[in-house]
Amino acid sequence: MDKRTTLVALVSIIFFTSGCDDQKKGNGNAESTQITKNDITTQLKLDKTQQPDDIEKKIKEIQANSTPEKIKKFNELKDDDPKILRESVVSEIKKKLPLLVDEATLMTDVSTDGGTFSYKYVTKGISASTMESDVWKDAMQKNIKNSYCSDDARLKVFRELFPEGVIYNYYLSDKLIYTYKALPSICS
């Protein structure tokens, strides 16, 4: 599978909104690039679990997202620029936050800075002294490495999409206690 196909598989929203119909090329102005409801309806593949209201909602989301400014910004991107996909990954994850990872850990934020992805976790029930201990840090690094270096195809794509690594930030209340940066090189 080539890199572009694999990247598309990473973000489910791309499947839902994709449609590369070269037959309807306009003259490049904002009016000719506006997406109509009929265009979107023909591009969507109905999932048996989706209700008509869900489709209408998605169509309205797509139309609202298709402003002349956003279309212009999209057209200015280079074909191989991963910025838009990186931003999409962050945006999709943010929609699902906060996420309770386990009894003591809540994922509260994610972000990207170039080729680096960052997680923000808030912990409860673990003292700062425990989190600052070498035993805890070693255990966390081992868990992160096992997860980050998984052979799962999605994680392989994730590492390619964020080649400068992933930063894991652990907070106790509002105080940053522990940070670990996983780089793709730890997986070799």
From Swiss-Prot:
Keywords recorded for this protein, A-Z: Plasmid
More about this protein: Plasmid Clo DF13 originates from Enterobacter cloacae but is stably maintained in and studied mostly from E.coli.
Protein name: Protein K
Lineage, highest ranks first: Bacteria, Pseudomonadati, Pseudomonadota, Gammaproteobacteria, Enterobacterales
